[in-house]
C-alpha cells in the first residue's frame, strides 16, 4: 500500500491544486475515512496527507503558483531568454488573432466594412482603392465577407448561396491555422448550410449541414467573392445579401437570423492589431495569452513545446510574472518584440519559394503544424494567409537583373503563351502594384492591377506583355500598369492555382527593364 501511495503522490506533481483534491476524494471514500480509526488506514492517510502537503509546498503546484519564480529558479539567464523567445513566438499568432477579434467586434451594431458584433456578417460593398488604408497590400480582386465567431455559448450556422463564380470561405482557428475552405460553386441546390462548433460542443449537428469542428472557441471567416469591376458590384451584392448566420438553437427553434448586439470598449479602438500587440508589456501579453489558451486550447502536438514553456509559467491558465527575468526583463522584451521579423525569418527560410524575380511563402503556410517560427512570421507579415492550394501570392521587388523596381524606368512583364498562370475551374489571377508603403498607387486611371478579367491585348503568338512605368504608355494603353516615380513592388495573385503553380513548378514571368 505504501508503494501505491508513493506512486499516487508522485502523480500529483503533474496535477493542479483542485485536481489533487479530486484525486484524494476519489481514492479515499467517506466510509474508509469513518473506518480509519479501526484500521491501519489512518497511517496510510497520514502518509498520503504528508506527501500531498509536501507536493503542494515543494512543487508550489508550479502551474498555478502564487510565486512563478519557483518554476524557473533552476534556469540560467540564457535558458530564460531562450524560453522567453520561444514563448513569444508560440503565442504571437494567438495574440494577433485575438487583437483582430477584439477590434473587429468592438461595436454595438455593424459599422462600415470592417466591424460587427461577434457572429454577425460584415460585407465589403466596394473594391479597394488608393484610399484604402485599413490593411496593407489590399486585394482589388474580391469583395470580402467576414464573421468573427464566438462558439463558447452555442454553435453557429452559416448559410451560403450557390454561385457560378469564385466565392471561397477561408476558416481560421484562433491560432491562425486554416481549418476549412468551403467553396460555393460546390453547393448543390440554392444554399449550403455549415455548422461551426467549438471544442466543448455537446449537441448534435443537423444532418443537412456540413459540420466544421473548430478546436478553438474563436473562429475567423474571410469569404472572398471575385468581382469583375465596378459594373459587377451589384452582382456581388446580390450574392452577399443571400448569406446568413444563425445560432444553432435559434435555427432549430424559431429559424431567426442572428442579430445580437455587441459592446464597445474604448481600449480596443486601436487601428492596427499588430501595433496594439507590439506595444503591449510582457506581463500583460502573457497574462492574456495564458487566459486565451483556456478557451482556445493548444493542439495536442504542442505538448512537448508547452512542457518547456511551463518552466516560465506560459501555458493554459498559468500565472506569468516578468519578475523571474530580473532587471533585464524590459530589455529582453524590447529586443524580442523589435527584432521578431529578424528572429523568425532565418527559421522560416526553407519555406520561402524563390522563382526568378519573384518569391512567395510556401507550404505549410496556414497549416503550420509545429512550425511555430514560420507561423509567427506569417502572423506578423501576412495574417490570414491562405494555404497554397487556395492561393499563392508571389511578390517581386526587383527586375530580371536584380535591380529594384522603380517607376522612373519602363518594364515589361512577359507571360509566354505556353506558360500561362493556369488555375482550376473558377480560379483567377491578377498583377497588382504597390508603393513602398504597401498601399495602392493613386493614379488618374484608377488602375491598380492587370487581371485575367481585363480587356488587354495579346501578342500574335498568344503571349502577353504587361507594361509598367510612371509615364503613360500610349503605345500599349490596355496593357499598361501605372507606377509611382519611386520604388514599387508587384504581387501576382493566383487563386485556385493548378498544382504545378501551387508547388512552384513553373517559371514565373520575367520582368525586363526596357531602358
What are these regions (language model features)?
Residues 7, 20-23, 29:
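Short, positively charged and aromatic/hydrophobic N-terminal segments
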Residues 57-60:
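C-terminal motif of bacterial Sec signal peptides marking the signal peptidase cleavage site
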Residues 62-515:
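A compositional/structural signature for long, glycine/proline-rich flexible linkers
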Residues 3, 19, 32, 43-44:
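Low-complexity, intrinsically disordered or signal/transmembrane-proximal segments
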Residues 38-48:
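Bacterial N-terminal signal peptides that target proteins for export
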Residues 14, 36, 49-50:
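Residue-level detector of intrinsically disordered terminal segments
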Amino acid at each position: 500500500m505504501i508503494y501505491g501511495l508513493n506512486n499516487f503522490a508522485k502523480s500529483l506533481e503533474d496535477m493542479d491544486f483542485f485536481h489533487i483534491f479530486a484525486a484524494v476524494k476519489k481514492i479515499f471514500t467517506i466510509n474508509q475515512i469513518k473506518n480509519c480509526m479501526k484500521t491501519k488506514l489512518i497511517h496510510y492517510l497520514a502518509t498520503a496527507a504528508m506527501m500531498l502537503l509536501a507536493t503542494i509546498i515543494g512543487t508550489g503546484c508550479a502551474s498555478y503558483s502564487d510565486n512563478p519564480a519557483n518554476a524557473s529558479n533552476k534556469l540560467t539567464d540564457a535558458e530564460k531568454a531562450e524560453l522567453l523567445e520561444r514563448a513569444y513566438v508560440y503565442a504571437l499568432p494567438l495574440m494577433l488573432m485575438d487583437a483582430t477579434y477584439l477590434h473587429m467586434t468592438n461595436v454595438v451594431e455593424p459599422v462600415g466594412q470592417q466591424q460587427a458584433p461577434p457572429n454577425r456578417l460584415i460585407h465589403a460593398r466596394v473594391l479597394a482603392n488608393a484610399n484604402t488604408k485599413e490593411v496593407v497590400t489590399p486585394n482589388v480582386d474580391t469583395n470580402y465577407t467576414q464573421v468573427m465567431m464566438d462558439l463558447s455559448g452555442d454553435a453557429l450556422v452559416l448559410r451560403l448561396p450557390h454561385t457560378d463564380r469564385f466565392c471561397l470561405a477561408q476558416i481560421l482557428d484562433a491560432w491562425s491555422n486554416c481549418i476549412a475552405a468551403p467553396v460555393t460553386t460546390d453547393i448543390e441546390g440554392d444554399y449550403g448550410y455549415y455548422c461551426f462548433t467549438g471544442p466543448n460542443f455537446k449537441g448534435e449537428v443537423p444532418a443537412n449541414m456540413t459540420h466544421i469542428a473548430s478546436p478553438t472557441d474563436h473562429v475567423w471567416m474571410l469569404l472572398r467573392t471575385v468581382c469583375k469591376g465596378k459594373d459587377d458590384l451589384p452582382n456581388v451584392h446580390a450574392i452577399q445579401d443571400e448569406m446568413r448566420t444563425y445560432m444553432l438553437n435559434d435555427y432549430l427553434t424559431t429559424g431567426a437570423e442572428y442579430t445580437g448586439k455587441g459592446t464597445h470598449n474604448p481600449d480596443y479602438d486601436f487601428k492596427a492589431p499588430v501595433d496594439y500587440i507590439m506595444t503591449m508589456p510582457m506581463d500583460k501579453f502573457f497574462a492574456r495569452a495564458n487566459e486565451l489558451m483556456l478557451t482556445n486550447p493548444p493542439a495536442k502536438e504542442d505538448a512537448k513545446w508547452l512542457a518547456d514553456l511551463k518552466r516560465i509559467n506560459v501555458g493554459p491558465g498559468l500565472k506569468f510574472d516578468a519578475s523571474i527575468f530580473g532587471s533585464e526583463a524590459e530589455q529582453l522584451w524590447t529586443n524580442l518584440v523589435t527584432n521578431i521579423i529578424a528572429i523568425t525569418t532565418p527559421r522560416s527560410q526553407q519555406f520561402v519559394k524563390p522563382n526568378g524575380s519573384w518569391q512567395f511563402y510556401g507550404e505549410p503556410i496556414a497549416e503550420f503544424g509545429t512550425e511555430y517560427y514560420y507561423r509567427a512570421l506569417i502572423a506578423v507579415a501576412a495574417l490570414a494567409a491562405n494555404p497554397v492550394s487556395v492561393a499563392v501570392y508571389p511578390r517581386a521587388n526587383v527586375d530580371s537583373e536584380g535591380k529594384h523596381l522603380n517607376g522612373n524606368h519602363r518594364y515589361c512583364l512577359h507571360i509566354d503563351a505556353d506558360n500561362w498562370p493556369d488555375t482550376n475551374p473558377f480560379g483567377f489571377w491578377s498583377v497588382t502594384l504597390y508603393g513602398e508603403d504597401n498601399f495602392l498607387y493613386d493614379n488618374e486611371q484608377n488602375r491598380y492591377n492587370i487581371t485575367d478579367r481585363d480587356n488587354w491585348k495579346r501578342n500574335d503568338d498568344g503571349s502577353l506583355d504587361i507594361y509598367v512605368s510612371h509615364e503613360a504608355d500610349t503605345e500599349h494603353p490596355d496593357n499598361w500598369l501605372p507606377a509611382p516615380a519611386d520604388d514599387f513592388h508587384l504581387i501576382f495573385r493566383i487563386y485556385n492555382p493548378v498544382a504545378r503553380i501551387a508547388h512552384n513548378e513553373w517559371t514565373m514571368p520575367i520582368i525586363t527593364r526596357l531602358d
